From Swiss-Prot:
Name of the protein: Striatin-interacting protein homolog
GO cellular component terms, A-Z: cytosol
UniProt record, GO biological process: cytoskeleton organization
Composition bias type Low complexity, residue spans: 177-188, 195-204, 791-811
Pfam families associated with the record: DUF3402 (PF11882), N1221 (PF07923)
Region: Disordered, residue numbers: 177-204, 791-814
Matches recorded under PANTHER family: AT25231P, PROTEIN REQUIRED FOR HYPHAL ANASTOMOSIS HAM-2
InterPro entries in UniProt: Far11/STRP, Far11/STRP_C, Far11/STRP_N
Length: 913
């Protein structure tokens, strides 16, 4: 190896260890990136070919006799916008006015994006876009656009049904013609064979052409669902750079009118997000926007009988309810052409603005702690930890009963007859007394915070203390409340509900359906799943334009479509995971039982298996630094910049691979030449962080931690060794949040690991000690069975068979905890929500059923779930995992079979709502 290669190797190894410069947030600091994600390359190509600017200026001159938008006064601008929106207020009786609606909506979109032809740089265009979107909001254009969006979805579904009926009729006619032709051939004599041969040949040719059309219409096999595999669009590329005749091109494109309307809605949302009054406008009902679609009776049935101040009356739906309705139709109506990426982006952005983003949530948490005088740096010690620490001492013994699970510390302390309440403990050293005083005054959580967020998260308190009832913990210890006390209002009738509480009231009976649909979309969008053939159609927005007769798509168009589709899936994954994390975090802040309900839905829907599957990449660095984009095809590309703004140099590269181990797509998308000439030292390719994949990775780790934390049954339902091997890859990534949450999840898995695993992975255990906050009495390093045996010895000294019954006792405690939690969740919903709805036959369900595919012990081949042998080994306490290689990881060998099983479990065609 020469000197140049050695120096290159050292520089690359040094650069790969540099910290990834990425800040985790749900709002992009640069609004240009959010707008770029909204448009696919194929959509931008269609908009360029449609010549919108010339048509817009022609229409503007006819109506205002002026040639530029900036020449208009504010009154003239409002008049022209009302003129365009006036077309949307007309009755849409069919497909006759579709082109006119599409043209006028494109004019409004052209104005909303800043009238690009009249701007000189990006900053000016973004400023004009904000002014125009504020103007659209002032003339109340958003409700009218939403009504048009609902009508366009109905037209799209009606057109789809008509096409299916026509295809069925054509198929029946062809079958009848074939039967008649066969009968004629049988009845005619042999002397007329020549004429019959000619007729038969003509009929056969016609039938072949018709059958080809029908196969596209029925979308058999891969094209049946316009599935999300790149191989569905790109197949068998010849050496000449053209597609072979066997390639199947998806001729179905997402509805253009719905796409352009969602673009306008998204631009209005992001340009008015700083206005506090806009939050209420998002949740305001639309008068006269009644949807008569029979496929969404769940929303129409959730009507409050006595309270409408929360915005839950779905006779007049709002922006969020309409988008959720489109999301439901996308899953239920087979073969629809909804632009699902835009639907998810609008839903995520509207929820973030209405409920508050992650930064707003952190600010609200800090305000809540400041109001009760709780400092963030206070030691988070619980009374349960202190009592266990005292009982674990060998010299002094507790005077409490052995079956006491949780008690206060003001009992007989350290064997002395004195209770410490407001005075020091008798005959104790001053240092120990001061330490106990600090622990007593800084218990976690404080009493004032308990009143606001509920009592201890997992409280099985057997003492006589009564937790005060507030609006946040209404049902706690209901048996201890005397009938003379004033009855507290249920949460659905409180005077000033939070925005998340209003959203929760509106969708309380549909959360199970919403979560499962999002998980199905996430499964279709994750890059780990190869050759996806499920029911979710993600490729309708990425379509190669039909070429002229006698020619085919070029190699450049084919590769552009492939990169566009990979980028498309990354954006969908980011939006889907962002919605799930936002709902989970707000539910935990609002009311803890709402969080338990949503996390239980995710767990019972096999979300843990899916999230681990999303993290199981062969090369994590390749995934985090993938370059699935074409800078020249972005909406805000470098070519549109003037020379003055493009003079700044690009940021330095973070990772520079020595060889072309990546795919040709990455080489083309990053602008490099790739492996040219097969040289030994090809030029390095500059790769930067993929912020979309970084966000998806951190969000997946956060969701795993929130779903399984403090739930031993959920942790033990998956193979701890296989899960840890996947997470070990992310511990080596030099990003603080990725390391922190991967170590947090591994910390939950350590008690279920073997001694050999702990010996091999001492580096990870040391990192957990250094980086993960640990409670004073957290015995996370103990084996799970050993900890259970110690508890059994403390609770019952006469039991001689603790080792044989440890697992059974653990299962009993776990089942009791899950059952108790489920009972509290059901009681909470019954008292606070269910009895205040006018049901009209509606069965409000607050738990998933096994018919929806939530069995955690159903076998999935070669997955994270426990096999029958592993379950038997755990029951006999003889399980031993063998790690041949420290860097080994789980590889899903049969993705198609596992996905098929997941789809069978996620059959929600007839949900129980």
């Amino acid at each position: 190896m020469d000197t140049a290669s050695i120096s290159s190797t050292s520089s690359n190894s040094k650069s790969s260890k540099e910290q990834i410069k990425y800040t985790f947030t749900d709002f992009d600091n640069d609004i240009k990136n959010e707008i770029n994600e909204l448009y696919s390359y194929s959509e931008l190509s269609i908009l360029k070919k449609s010549n919108i600017s010339n048509q817009f200026y022609h229409d503007l001159h006819e109506y205002t006799s002026k040639n530029k938008w900036r020449d208009l006064t504010d009154i003239e601008k409002i008049d022209y916008l009302q003129h365009l929106i006036g077309f949307f207020e007309l009755s849409m009786k069919g497909q006759d006015n579709y082109n006119r609606y599409l043209l006028k909506s494109r004019f409004i979109w052209y104005i909303a994006q800043g009238v690009r032809d009249e701007t000189h740089d990006r900053k000016d265009q973004l400023h004009q876009s904000k002014l125009n979107c504020i103007l659209l909001r002032e003339i109340n254009a958003l409700p009218i656009i939403l009504k048009t969006l609902v009508l366009s979805s109905q037209i799209s579904n009606e057109t789809l049904r008509n096409q299916q009926q026509q295809q069925q009729q054509q198929q029946q006619q062809q079958q009848q013609q074939q039967q008649q032709q066969q009968q004629q051939n049988e009845n005619e004599g042999s002397g007329e064979g020549g004429t019959n041969f000619t007729t038969t040949t003509t009929t056969t040719t016609t039938t072949t052409t018709a059958n080809t059309f029908i196969s596209h219409g029925k979308r058999n096999n891969i094209i049946k669902n316009n599935s999300g595999s790149v191989s569905g669009v790109i197949k068998n590329i010849n050496s000449n750079g053209t597609l072979s005749s066997s390639m199947k091109v998806n001729v179905k494109r997402a509805d253009l009118l719905m796409s352009i309307l969602l673009d306008i809605i998204y631009l209005i949302i992001i340009n008015n997000k700083d206005d506090e009054l806009f939050k209420e406008e998002i949740f305001e009902s639309l008068e006269g926007c009644n949807n008569n679609n029979n496929n969404n009776n769940n929303y129409n049935n959730n009507i409050l009988g006595k309270n409408n101040n929360n915005g839950t009356n779905c006779d007049n739906p709002n922006l969020i309810s309409i988008i959720l309705q489109l999301l439901s139709e996308f899953n239920e109506i087979d073969g629809n052409l909804y632009p699902i990426k835009k639907i998810l982006m609008v839903l995520w952005k509207s929820l973030t603005i209405f409920m508050g983003g992650l930064e707003d949530l952190d600010r609200l948490k800090q305000e809540r702690l400041d109001n009760v005088g709780y400092k963030k740096g206070t030691p988070k010690t619980r009374s349960y930890d202190i009592s266990n620490f005292i009982k674990s001492t060998q010299r002094y013994h507790s005077q409490l009963k052995s079956n006491s699970v949780l008690h206060k510390v003001n009992t007989h302390y350290l064997g002395t007859p004195k209770e410490y309440k407001d005075v020091d403990v008798f005959r104790l050293p001053l240092s120990l007394s001061d330490s106990l005083s600090v622990l007593q005054t800084n218990l976690y959580p404080p009493e004032k915070v308990r009143k606001e967020i509920g009592i201890n998260y997992y409280s099985f308190n057997n003492n006589d203390t009564i937790t005060p009832h507030t609006q946040s913990d209404y049902f706690y210890n209901t048996s201890n409340i005397s009938s003379s006390k004033k009855q507290i209002k249920p949460r659905i009738l409180i005077d000033n509900p939070s925005n998340f509480e209003r959203f929760y009231c509106m969708n309380v009976s549909n959360f199970s359906k919403i979560v499962i649909i999002l998980l199905k979309i996430l499964l279709a969008a994750t890059p780990v799943v190869k050759n996806y053939t499920g029911p979710i159609n993600l490729i309708a927005e990425i379509v190669i334009d039909q070429s002229s007769p006698g020619s085919s798509a070029s190699l450049v168009e084919t590769m552009q479509s492939a990169i566009d589709f990979l980028r498309h899936k990354e954006i969908i994954s980011k939006s889907t995971l962002g919605i799930l994390l936002l709902i989970i975090k707000h539910s935990k802040f609002n009311q803890h039982l709402q969080f338990e309900y949503l996390s239980k839905i995710m767990y019972e829907s096999n979300a843990l298996v899916l999230l681990y599957k999303c993290l199981n990449h062969e090369s994590v660095e390749k995934y985090l630094f993938s370059q699935n984009y074409l800078n020249s095809e972005e909406y805000f590309n470098e070519e549109s910049l003037p020379s003055s703004s493009a003079a700044s140099p690009p940021p330095p590269p973070i990772f520079q691979p020595l060889n072309c181990s990546g795919s040709s797509i990455n080489s083309i998308s990053s602008g490099g030449a790739g492996c040219e000439g097969g040289g030994a030292n090809p030029p390095p390719v500059q790769l930067f962080e993929n912020y979309k994949n970084l966000f998806s990775t951190i969000t997946s780790l956060k969701l795993i931690q929130k779903v399984m934390k403090h739930h031993p049954s959920r942790i033990s339902s998956l193979s701890a060794s296989k899960s840890a091997n996947i997470l070990k890859k992310y511990c080596s990534i030099n990003h603080p949040m990725i390391r922190l949450y991967s170590l947090k999840v591994i910390k939950n898995l350590v008690p279920y690991q073997t001694k050999k695993w702990k010996q091999i992975n001492m580096r990870i255990i040391s990192d957990i000690y250094l980086e993960v906050p640990i409670h004073i009495n957290d015995n996370w390093l103990f084996s799970h069975n050993s900890a259970i045996n110690n508890n059994n010895n403390n609770s019952n000294n006469n039991n001689n068979n603790n080792n044989n019954n440890s697992t059974n006792n653990d299962n009993g405690l776990t089942d009791e905890h899950e059952v108790t939690l489920q009972e509290k969740v059901e009681e909470y919903h019954r008292v606070n929500y269910e009895q205040w709805y006018t049901n009209d036959g509606l069965d409000m369900c607050y738990k998933n059923d096994h018919s929806m595919g939530i069995g955690i012990f159903d076998d999935l081949l070669n997955s994270l779930q426990l096999t029958t042998e592993e379950k038997q080994a755990i029951e006999n306490d003889r399980l031993a995992y063998i790690d041949k290689d420290e860097g080994s990881s789980l590889i899903f060998m049969n993705d198609a079979l596992e996905d098929e099983l997941l789809f069978n479990k996620w059959n929600i065609q007839k949900p129980k709502f």
